[in-house]
Regions:
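Glycine-aromatic micro-motifs
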Residues: 1-128
Length: 128
């Protein structure tokens, strides 16, 4: 299955090992209909779909076998859920979203202006 990764399993991030050698198809962007938040003090991103005011989120597209998918899911936080999302080229891929109501409840910061998790993490490691 085609799976969009936009967080801690990106190339160079700590959870990339959870992909179990999945085939990287390349950099990819979502359609401009999502928001990106830093969840649990920067532990992982949370994205959710919006009707307006969304951005294209930069990430990576992978081809996963059922075993690789199971390995990835085992490392995902329990609040996240898998859905089919739209990519910027009109195609679709599976991805993990985070419930908007939990983001709002906890006041997790909107980091959409960074355009992706890797840019956000690079900005936080450059500080202090």
């Amino acid at each position: 299955m085609r799976f969009f990764i936009c967080g801690s399993a990106l190339t160079g991030q700590p959870d990339n090992r959870n992909l179990g050698g999945a085939t990287l198809l390349g950099a990819a962007r979502t359609a401009p209909k999502y928001r990106l938040h830093s969840v649990k003090n920067g532990w992982h991103p949370g994205i959710y779909e919006v009707e307006s005011g969304g951005i294209s989120i930069l990430g990576e597209l992978y081809e996963l076998t059922p075993q690789q998918h199971a390995s990835l899911m085992a490392g995902e936080p329990p609040d996240m859920y898998q859905v089919t999302i739209e990519m910027d080229d009109g195609s679709h891929a599976e991805a993990m979203l985070y419930p908007r109501e939990l983001i709002e409840k906890h006041g997790y910061p909107d980091i959409s202006h960074f355009g992706g998790w890797a840019a956000y993490k690079a900005s936080t490691s450059a500080v202090g």
